[in-house]
C-alpha cells in the first residue's frame, strides 16, 4: 500500500544564512552603531538570541530578521516561539526565539482528525514527530497532500518518504 510521511523539519543552512545576513545588516545600520544590538544562532539547541539596549531595539532587530528569513526561504518565521523579553545587566535586554522543529502531538492529532473527517479513504498514524499516511492508491494520497496543504497554513509542513 502506498504511503508517505508528513513532517516539519528546519533547513538549518537557510536559517543560518538568514541570521548571518541579519547580523550584517545590524552591524551596518547607523542607528545601531555603538549599541549592544546583536543576534546569535545556537543550532544545537535551536535558539536565536536577540540582544539590544531596549525593547524598541529588539523590535527593530526582529524587523530585520523576519524578512531575511523570508528571502532565504527559511520558512522558520512561522516556527518561531517568541519568549519573554529579559532584562540583563544595566539597561540591556535580550529575547530568545525558540525554533519549533517537528510536529508536536497537538498538531499531529489535528492532522489525523482532519483526515478522518475528510472522508478520504486513508489511514493516518502518529510516529514520533511525523504522521504517516497510508492509502490504497497513489491518487488518494495526492488528494491528501493537497487537502492538508490547503487546511493547515499556519505551520510549514513537508511531505516526504513517498512509497508505492
UniProtKB/Swiss-Prot annotation:
GO molecular function terms listed in the Swiss-Prot or TrEMBL record: nucleotide binding
Gene3D superfamilies, per database record: 3.30.70.860, YajQ-like, domain 2 (3.30.70.990)
Keyword Nuclease tagged: no
Alphabetical UniProt keywords: Nucleotide-binding
Keyword Nucleotide-binding in annotation: yes
GO CC, one annotated term: cytosol
Family: Belongs to the YajQ family.
Described purpose of this protein according to its UniProt entry: Nucleotide-binding protein.
Name of the protein in its database record: Nucleotide-binding protein Mfla_1706
The species this protein was found in: Methylobacillus flagellatus (strain ATCC 51484 / DSM 6875 / VKM B-1610 / KT)
Lineage of producing organism: Bacteria, Pseudomonadati, Pseudomonadota, Betaproteobacteria, Nitrosomonadales
Amino acid at each position: 500500500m502506498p504511503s508517505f510521511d508528513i513532517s516539519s523539519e528546519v533547513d538549518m543552512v537557510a536559517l543560518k544564512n538568514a541570521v548571518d545576513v541579519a547580523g550584517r545588516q545590524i552591524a551596518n545600520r547607523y542607528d545601531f552603531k555603538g549599541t549592544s544590538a546583536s543576534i546569535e544562532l545556537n543550532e544545537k539547541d535551536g535558539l536565536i538570541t536577540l540582544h539590544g539596549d531596549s525593547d524598541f531595539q529588539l523590535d527593530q532587530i526582529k524587523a530585520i530578521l523576519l524578512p531575511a528569513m523570508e528571502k532565504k526561504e527559511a520558512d522558520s518565521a512561522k516556527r518561531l516561539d517568541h519568549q519573554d523579553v529579559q532584562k540583563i545587566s544595566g539597561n540591556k535586554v535580550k529575547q530568545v526565539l525558540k525554533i519549533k522543529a517537528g510536529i508536536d502531538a497537538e498538531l499531529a492529532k489535528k492532522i489525523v482528525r482532519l483526515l478522518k473527517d475528510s472522508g478520504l479513504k486513508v489511514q493516518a498514524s502518529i510516529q514520533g514527530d511525523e504522521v504517516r499516511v497510508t492509502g490504497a492508491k497513489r491518487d488518494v494520497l495526492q488528494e491528501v497532500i493537497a487537502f492538508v496543504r490547503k487546511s493547515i497554513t499556519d505551520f510549514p509542513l513537508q511531505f516526504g518518504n513517498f512509497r508505492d
